[in-house]
A protein has these predicted regions:
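Short boundary motifs at domain starts and secondary-structure transition points
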Residues: 1-17, 58-59
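Hydrophobic, Leu/Ile/Phe/Ala-enriched alpha-helical segments that form helix-helix packing faces
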Residues: 34-46, 86-90, 118-126, 161-169
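Helix-loop-strand module that forms the ligand-binding subsite of alpha/beta enzymes
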Residues: 1, 56-125
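Glycine-rich phosphate/pyrophosphate-binding loop and the adjoining helix
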Residues: 133, 137-211
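A short beta-strand-loop structural module common to alpha/beta enzyme folds
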Residues: 41-60
Length: 211
């Protein structure tokens, strides 16, 4: 399975943007978890973090080297228009584009549709689509913010998130990062996505989300 060729060439990201569409507690939590993990791995390895940029206010004259979108699987036309406006701000074709999709546990098909639209939007602009993760947790995952990251409830999502962390740190697609790191890239979806589902039965998971 091939992704955009540039995404298979590692690149140290000097600047990065994190964009949540729409703004919600769940998407904010997922981006927080990603950024926290990136920072933790940077501390452990003694490497520097990419500088955060806000696309709508960045006046430094340089586009972001990488961008991570956090979106819902029910991305409507208005939200997709906001995504495309953000992509138009990137300018250069060297930008690596990643995505975190919050999806319904029962209907992962919608996530496939959203990912397909996002990838097409990147390809139309010549941007490097680098895949991402689909968090099949439904709504309410922000309730796990204070749960152990590798505990029973968060572990499947944390393991998927760590694959995204590795790709962002390498500045390449998740698939290529997995191959470079000796991991298994065979379980990736056709769009370079990692799907993560709860490790507990649905009734227990749903009860946990109501707390």
């Amino acid at each position: 399975m091939e992704v955009t060729a540039r995404g298979d060439v590692p690149k140290t990201l000097q600047t990065i943007a994190f964009v949540s569409i729409p703004e919600s507690a769940d998407l904010e939590f997922l981006l927080w978890d990603l950024q926290d993990a990136i920072a933790a791995y940077a501390r452990l390895s003694g490497t520097s973090l990419p500088r955060l940029v806000a696309l709508e206010t960045d006046d430094g004259g340089s586009a972001a080297d990488g961008i991570v979108f956090a979106v819902e699987d029910a991305l409507n036309n208005e939200a997709m228009s906001v995504v495309e406006q953000a992509l138009d701000c990137l300018g250069g074709t060297e930008t690596r584009v990643y995505v975190v999709v919050q999806a319904d546990c029962e209907s992962p098909e919608r996530a496939h549709t959203v990912v397909g639209h996002l990838r097409e939007a990147c390809e139309r602009r010549g941007l490097s689509w680098c895949g991402g993760i689909v968090v099949c947790a439904g709504s309410g995952i922000a309730a796990l913010r204070h749960s152990p990251r590798m505990g029973l409830l968060r572990r499947p999502f944390s393991e998927a998130m760590d694959k995204l962390v590795g790709a962002v740190r390498m500045g390449c697609s998740i698939e290529h990062a997995q191959r470079l790191g000796g991991g298994n890239a065979e379980n990736l979806g056709t769009d370079g996505m990692v799907f993560a589902e709860p490790a507990v039965p649905a009734p227990i998971w749903n009860l946990s989300m109501r707390k």
